[in-house]
Curated annotation (Swiss-Prot):
The gene is TRIM9. This is E3 ubiquitin-protein ligase TRIM9. It comes from Bos taurus. Its main location: cytoplasm. InterPro entries: B30.2/SPRY (IPR001870), B30.2/SPRY_sf (IPR043136), Bbox_C (IPR003649), ConA-like_dom_sf (IPR013320), COS_domain (IPR017903), E3_ligase_FN3/SPRY (IPR050617), FN3_dom (IPR003961), FN3_sf (IPR036116). One of its GO terms (molecular function) is zinc ion binding. GO terms for biological process: proteasome-mediated ubiquitin-dependent protein catabolic process; protein ubiquitination. Interacts with SNAP25.
Length: 710
């Protein structure tokens, strides 16, 4: 069970979890540590101005998109995105175990009560110390996070099995050894904390203080607290919401947001998730067994390499001694090469042993932790963490299956010495390759008839030469950054076809492929030049739009079912080049003021475009228009829209500007400057307006000529 200890320690304080709570990202943290890493945000970032709460966050943040990309937008334009809504950037520190920790928002309260129950500063933000995802707390503060009763039970059992000394639960820094436990408060104290937080006077004088060992026994014998609903603290969980994947109480079903969701019996889902976790553990257990056998094989390889090295050196010395008069100078050079090869092989094998040992220890720890979790009889507590554990188990199992259990180095020295040449040819004496049975694979051939580009995606296909007899274990596809920069790996695997998304529009990329096996890698294929689409073709995105938006015409036409303004985004984001699209007004009743422009992916969807700091827009009625960003209105311009009007939006990253047009005439000055980052086309409207999107358009001639003059 020693490997499991990593699963039981808080990433902030490095000690065993004390009163752990579950963050929305499924990671755990001590209640006291959660309070210490709270950060108070400015009023402009308050929950009223952002779609975030203690139990919910917005989908993405454009800063996180750039930071979490496989490669930055400036470098290549393709990558993998994801993350919580970020809090404002805050200087970070390093905790003892190397995770990111924000500075305390305020001094910890000096009270004998649980720190998480004290008041939380208004507009507080907390960042997960493991995945660095952030969210803003609602009025409930830390009480909005469920407590991990299952983890508490596992820690109690682990500490009992280790007979570990009980620590004080209120020490601000390194916890000292506890000297007493209050049976009423259920808290362990050291002497200084007891005198400061639990003085023997007033109501506390009636509390019973017992030795820590006796307190541990009484705590173990007392029934464990049942997990309660975070929204209704007096109610126990009674059902499981299938849509939200969380236990809920009966009040949530009758009054809360789960009233229209599908629910199932708590006990049935508890058994189902236990069964799923057990099945996942079976597969991971097999991988762990294979890993142990693989480590034995690697350790044997070290001995074999040592023996083969000695044998090879002896053979080399014997051959050199026969030609000693002519080979003295050459012998030293050859021995140096053998030693270098020897050290290289050992280094590769030892590095792989170290890597596999760490991975196996982590896998074993996860397995032991999961087995302990399965022993728990708290259905709601188990269901709070089961989905995350199942995903972790599957992910760990997949990681073992990606060529991890294959030696990276052979034990043989693929060298031999040819001593047949005459003495006058000694200066040409060198090692020759003898292991012709294991050559590298042949160079792959790109199948040009199957390679193509569509919009900002590229599909490439390749194959081995028809007469090749050496099998390839996999392929490595490389692309440059679209600006003639260095090549970077974008795919490694056994497939012979790959589609790369997220490239820049109107850009030229170079692609090449090579094959590999245990012996090494092949030569690169011929370089293929790929040209992405000059203009962007896209539609509106139903997945990110407000639920009141109504789509038609293959998602090119939108209107709304509400009298309030609702936001819809385009499916394609831009960060480079010049892009132009138009929207025609199909219906315009009662003089509303729709807004057109660009926005980040996490823009607010239930207010007019431009009300928050994630959108840059022009809103217009039948007489005039305004530019708006972060609820700031500028540049009132005469001239409005009617049914049949055309609104043009021009996003120019070369000049870092955003410009608007109405009926082919520029509306006002340049709307916004210094435009940088990842932007999505955006519209806000109500039920009185219907618009149709037109894409794949060239930049207007009058703008191009004006730009060339400038």
């Amino acid at each position: 069970m020693e490997e499991m200890e990593e699963e039981l320690k808080c990433p902030v304080c490095g000690s065993f979890y004390r009163e752990p709570i579950i963050l929305p990202c499924s990671h755990n943290i001590c209640q006291a540590c959660a309070r210490n890493i709270l950060v108070q945000t400015p009023e402009s970032e308050s929950p009223q101005s952002r779609r975030a709460s203690g139990s919910g966050v917005s989908d993405y943040d454009y800063l996180d998109l750039d930071k979490m990309s496989l490669y930055s937008e400036a470098d290549s334009g393709y990558g993998s995105y994801g993350g919580f809504a970020s809090a404002p950037t805050t200087p970070c520190q390093k905790s003892p175990n190397g995770v990111r920790v924000f500075p305390p928002a305020m001094p910890p309260p000096a009270t004998h009560l649980s720190p998480a129950l004290a008041s939380v500063p208004r507009n507080s933000c907390i960042t997960c110390p493991q995945c660095h995802r952030s969210l803003i707390l609602d009025d409930r503060g830390l009480r909005g996070f469920p407590k991990n009763r299952v983890l508490e039970g596992v820690i109690d059992r682990y500490q009992q099995s280790k007979a570990a000394a009980l620590k004080c639960q209120l020490c601000e820094k390194a916890p000292k050894e506890a000297t007493v436990m209050c049976e009423q408060c259920d808290v362990f104290y050291c002497d200084p904390c007891r005198l400061r937080c639990h003085p023997p006077r007033g109501p506390l004088a009636k509390h019973r203080l017992v030795p820590p060992a006796q307190g541990r026994v009484s705590r173990r014998l007392s029934p464990r607290k049942v997990s309660t609903c975070t929204d209704h603290e007096l109610e126990n969980h009674s059902m499981y919401c299938v849509q939200c994947k969380m236990p809920v109480c009966y009040q949530c079903l009758e009054e809360g947001k789960h009233s229209s969701h599908e629910v199932k019996a708590l006990g049935a889902m508890w058994k189902l998730h236990k069964s799923q976790l057990s099945q996942a553990l079976n597969g991971l257990s097999d991988r762990a067994k294979e890993a142990k056998e693989f480590l034995v094989q690697l350790r044997n390889m070290v001995q074999q390499i040592q023996e083969n090295s000695v044998e090879f050196e002896a053979c080399l010395v014997a051959q050199c001694d026969a030609l000693i008069d002519a080979l003295n100078r050459r012998k030293a050079q050859l021995l140096a090469r053998v030693n270098k090869e020897h050290e290289h092989k050992l280094k590769v094998v030892r590095d792989q042993i170290s890597h596999c040992t760490v991975k196996l220890r982590q896998t074993t720890g996860l397995m032991e932790y999961c087995l302990e979790v399965i022993k728990e009889n708290d259905p709601s507590g188990f269901l709070q963490i089961s989905d995350a554990l199942i995903r972790r188990v599957h992910l760990t199992e997949d990681q073992w299956g990606k060529g991890t259990l294959t030696p990276r180095m052979t034990t043989d020295f693929d060298l031999s010495l040819d001593n047949s040449p005459l003495l006058q040819s000694i200066h040409q004496l060198d090692f020759v390759q003898m292991k012709a049975s294991s050559p590298v694979p042949a160079t792959p051939i790109l199948q040009l008839e199957d390679c193509c580009t569509h919009n900002n995606s590229a599909t490439l296909s390749w194959k081995q030469p028809p007469l090749s007899t050496v099998p390839a274990e996999g392929y490595i596809l490389e692309l440059d950054d679209g600006n003639g920069g260095q090549f970077r790996e974008v795919y490694v695997g056994k497939e012979t076809m790959c589609t790369v998304d997220g490239l820049h529009f109107n850009s030229t990329y170079n692609a090449r492929i090579k094959a590999f096996n245990k012996t090494g890698v092949s030569q690169y294929s011929k370089t293929l030049v790929l040209q992405t689409s000059e203009v962007a073709w896209f539609a509106f995105d139903p997945g990110s739009a407000h639920s009141d938006i109504i789509f038609s015409n293959d998602n090119l036409t939108v209107t709304c079912s509400s009298y309030d303004d609702r936001v819809v985004l385009g499916k394609t984001g831009f960060s480079k080049g010049v892009h132009y699209w138009e929207l025609t007004v199909d219906r315009y009743d009662n003089h509303p003021d729709p807004a057109f422009g660009v926005a980040r992916i996490d823009v607010m969807k239930d207010v007019m475009l431009g009300k928050d700091d994630k959108a840059w827009a022009m809103y217009v009625d039948n007489n005039r228009s305004w530019f708006m960003h972060n609820n700031s209105h500028t540049n009132r311009t005469e001239g409005g829209i009617t049914k049949g009007a055309t609104i043009g939006v021009l996003l120019d990253f070369n000049r870092k500007t955003l410009t608007f047009f109405i009926n082919d005439e520029q509306q006002g000055p340049i709307a916004f400057e210094n435009v940088e980052g990842l932007f999505f086309p955006a519209v806000s409207l109500n039920r009185n307006v219907q618009v149709t999107l037109h894409t794949g358009l060239q930049v207007p001639d009058f703008y191009s000529s004006r730009a060339s003059i400038a």
